[in-house]
């Protein structure tokens, strides 16, 4: 799997922050401690969704559906998962995807490293990849 590329919504090394979960590394450590495995991006995005709903209910100061919907539509915040801002159609338009590359050390231990966008990269993309005969 070394050198394989994969797009994802989130990685624990991204430097987004919030007041509840703090950052991705803190979230991942707490998740690992609780569930005994690393959090997939789906868990992170679900946790961030709860922060968005909490914020919307507080700004709406109501459980009225229209007020909550309007508060959600006006959301513009950062969470440990990333920036959250909704377009008129409901899509989050303020959070880019990330690209991983599988990188292995000399012992054979492999892990995903963020290689793009460069603003969030934790490693440099290896391309072109070495020929099979050079590995």
Language-model region placement:
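Extracellular/periplasmic bilobed ligand-binding domains
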Residues: 1-12
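Glycine-centered flexibility sites
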Residues: 2-3, 36, 61, 82
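Extracellular/periplasmic ligand-binding modules, especially the Venus flytrap/periplasmic-binding
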Residues: 15-74
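Solvent-exposed loop/turn segments at secondary-structure junctions
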Residues: 10-14, 45-49, 105-106, 120
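Solvent-exposed, acidic/polar segments of extracytosolic/periplasmic ligand-binding ectodomains
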Residues: 2, 73-135
């Amino acid at each position: 799997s070394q050198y394989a590329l994969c797009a994802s919504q989130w990685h624990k090394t991204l430097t987004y922050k919030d007041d509840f979960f703090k950052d991705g590394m803190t979230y991942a450590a707490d998740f690992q401690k609780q569930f005994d495995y690393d959090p997939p991006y789906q868990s992170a995005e679900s946790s961030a969704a709860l922060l968005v709903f909490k914020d919307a209910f507080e700004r709406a100061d109501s459980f009225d559906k229209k007020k909550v919907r309007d508060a959600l539509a006006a959301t513009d915040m950062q969470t440990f998962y990333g920036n959250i801002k909704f377009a008129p159609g409901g899509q989050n338009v303020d959070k880019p995807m990330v690209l991983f590359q599988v990188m292995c050390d000399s012992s054979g231990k492999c892990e995903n490293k963020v290689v793009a966008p460069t603003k969030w990269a934790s490693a440099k993309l290896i391309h072109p990849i070495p020929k099979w005969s050079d590995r």
